[in-house]
A protein has these predicted regions:
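Active-site acidic catalytic loop and adjacent metal/ATP-binding pocket
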Residues: 44-58, 64-65, 176-221
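ATP/Mg2+ or Mg2+-diphosphate-binding catalytic cores
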Residues: 14, 165-170, 263-271
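Helical subdomain adjoining the active site within ATP-dependent kinase catalytic cores
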Residues: 215, 246-248, 261-271
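ATP-binding pocket architecture of kinase catalytic cores
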Residues: 44-145, 183
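Intrinsically disordered, low-complexity terminal tails and inter-domain linkers enriched
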Residues: 5-20
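An alpha-helical support segment within catalytic cores of ATP-dependent transferases
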Residues: 19-38, 139-191, 196, 202-203, ...
């Protein structure tokens, strides 16, 4: 959830390195990506905590290639992510994929120049992203998506840790005290809408990227995940744009987001 992923797709001189580490067998498939000639420039995009992202350039055409992390410990459902991504692309909320490998080892999409959500977003920015999240929550990409169980997800992450660790013991105790959010309100949620996963293009449109952790869940979790990443002086303003029917459960949602994030971090600090 919050801060678990960071895969910015805007490129500056400090965020790329000219490194060729994409496997040759993948680069050999460039014709499948709709290119007329093999790539002449490959730039590694820094920032991804889960996957590896590359800017591919061929005769002025810019693509983004993402090598997917296949570790099962991440709790990622790649086939679901693909279905959700394709649905969201049709809805105009995320960039369209040009190609994905049969094993979902990697996929390629158009590179969209832009910037991530600012560290101190404006009121208009905050209103715009809450509107996008509301659209996301109204989507139904497929009928058999898994449902996020916060307690189960936290327990799965902590099972990868030293069970005798004081931090793990304390966190397990906090998890047992969680109050579930109303199950009847569950809908499609992104579940990782932190600032780095928002891209504002040159026309001012916001795109929402990286749907790895998307699942059926309570919509307040999406708003909480983003809210916790905003400066404190922006959090109250952001909450004013959240649908009124969710505001009573926002404190609970923030607690759940924090616990899931801490569990994930403990697992990946020791795993």
């Amino acid at each position: 959830m919050a801060q678990r992923l960071s895969s910015p797709t805007s490129v500056s001189s400090t965020s790329v390195a000219s490194v060729r580490v994409i496997p040759e067998q993948i680069l050999a498939e460039w014709r499948k990506w709709g290119l007329s000639s093999q790539p002449d420039t490959i730039l590694s995009i820094k920032g991804g905590l889960t996957n590896q992202n590359y800017l591919i350039v061929s005769d002025g055409v810019e693509l983004l290639l993402r090598l997917n992390n296949t570790a099962t410990s991440l709790g990622i459902y790649r086939e679901e992510e693909l279905a959700i991504h394709q649905h969201m692309a049709k809805a105009g909320l995320t960039p369209t994929l040009r190609y994905y490998s049969p094993e979902l080892e990697y996929w390629v999409r158009d590179f969209i120049p832009g910037t991530t959500l600012a560290a101190a977003p404006s009121s208009d920015d905050l209103q715009a992203v809450t509107e996008v999240l509301s659209i996301v929550h109204a989507q139904s990409p497929r009928s058999n998506l898994h449902t996020l169980d916060i307690q189960a997800a936290c327990s799965q992450y902590l099972a990868q840790c030293d069970g005798h660790s004081e931090a793990v013991i304390k966190l397990k105790e906090e998890i047992t005290q969680l109050v579930p959010l109303p199950a009847e309100d569950a809908c499609l949620c992104h579940l990782d809408p932190l600032p780095a996963n928002w891209l504002r293009d040159s026309e001012g449109k916001f795109w929402l990227l990286d749907w790895e952790y998307a699942a059926l869940a309570h919509p307040a979790l999406d708003y909480a995940a983003l809210q916790l990443q905003l400066p404190e002086n922006k959090q109250a303003l952001f909450e004013s744009f959240i649908p009124e029917n969710l505001r009573d459960v926002m404190a609970n949602a923030r607690t759940q987001v924090r616990l899931l994030d801490r569990s994930w971090r403990l697992a990946h600090a020791t795993g």
